[in-house]
Amino acid sequence: PMESGLYYLEFSDGSGSPLRVKGPETEEAKQAMVGGTESSLYIGAAKTNRFWAVSKFDLDTDEFYLDVEYAAPAGEITWRVSLRKKIAKFQRWMSRKKKRLFVRYFNFFSKHVKRTGNKIFFCSASRSRIGGNEQFIRDRMLERGLDKKFVFRYDFVASINERRSLRAFMRFGYYLATSDIIVLDDYYPQVYLPDYPPDVKVIQAWHACGAFKTVGLERMGKPGAPELNTRIHKCYTHIPVSSELSVRHNAEAFGLDESKFYPVGVPRTDIFFDPDYIRRTKKKMYEAFPQAKKAKTVYLYAPTFRGINARDAYFPFQKVDFVKWGQFCKETDACLLVKMHPFVRESVEIPPEYADYIIDAASYREVNDILFIVDVLITDYSSIIYEFSLLRRPMYFYAFDQKMYEATRDFYEPYEKTIPGQPIKSFDELMDTLREGKFDYQWLDSFVRKNFTYTDGKATDRVIDQIILGKK
């Protein structure tokens, strides 16, 4: 049986010679075939292994392809399908019921437990323990002795889909309802459900810098866009960002007033100005990746995922020739670290003959730590470019599907005007570019000035002083 996925079509005549099939003539017609959902082909007439297929068009390669999904066999379209529909309906009802109960639970403790003004709650639904911006804030507060003033509370789960015990969930709700300051670092559905008292601070210590890809309400009309009347993100009272440009971008994305955004800097960028941290981290990274210490040049390939969200995230690995990249590394005495986005579940297939030159760095969570041993970054649409730019090192942009990405996700500003470089469209062009090694540092300097109000390593202190402590 075939698998669900994207299938590019090759056409040939009766003798086997390839045929060029003419696609849509106008850009409007091409765009219409990018995100279509109406099934246009049905594959298989047997009782098993039947599939729906949607005919689509690749804007970057001018090729037709089929978006194929498994379809239930005829024998299944009876009591099994009916049962599944009933189960799904019951699950939706239960979900609504749970949300209402959670809000009532929150409201009870919020009303009857007096706040003391000193309880700060760190939480996340994307990591199992404290990390990222939240950890930098907490650790710096400890260094400054603020644990004598504040009571620290914590609740972390690896993902929004992770099941947890009733006791753990009730503790989360209690902390949420009785804390004076709530700090989160990503999307967290349960945080958006209740209404908070006006004196409670809800701080979104967002994990990304800059104003790059469209998010939230900026994605209207694109796959995965939120509803206009959504409660998502609306509870935030304070959001630290890296620049005035980020203020405008995130205000539009979250549908919030610009006054809720503070261009004080992003805490996790402080490490790029801390010589002791850099020295310790480089030693740790070389122990984790010994091949990197021996190499003349260390490359990092860190692309973002494709798809709408974590559930359907993927990466088109066929666009990367790891055999050619391995040969390049061997010839140039280089090392390639590959760090896929955490949403991508498929592992990188490294050619065995180049296992000493290509390393899958997926097991190491904090990509910023890896950056200190990297000489050259290769990415596409990842926000990693902001942190890496602070090191003033070359970066290249392998954007093989730029038009498709713009059609389905898009950018806050035009892609070519955002990145400190030029898009690279083919893998062979990428290899040629890496061999040449040319890079315009003027682009990089302009990029840093545009996206960082401060480059002094004191962002965490500003977040603590201006947002948590409320100093002017």
Regions found by a protein language model. Name each.
Residues 129-140, 253, 261, 267-350, ...:
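Conserved catalytic-core segment of nucleotide-activated headgroup transferases in glycan assembly
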Residues 160-228:
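Extended catalytic core of nucleotide-activated donor transferases of GT-like folds
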Residues 107, 277, 426-472:
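C-terminal amphipathic helix plus adjacent low-complexity
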Residues 1-118, 143:
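Basic, ligand-binding patches in group-transfer machinery
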Residues 166-181, 189, 342-386:
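Donor nucleotide-activated moiety binding/catalytic core segment of transferases
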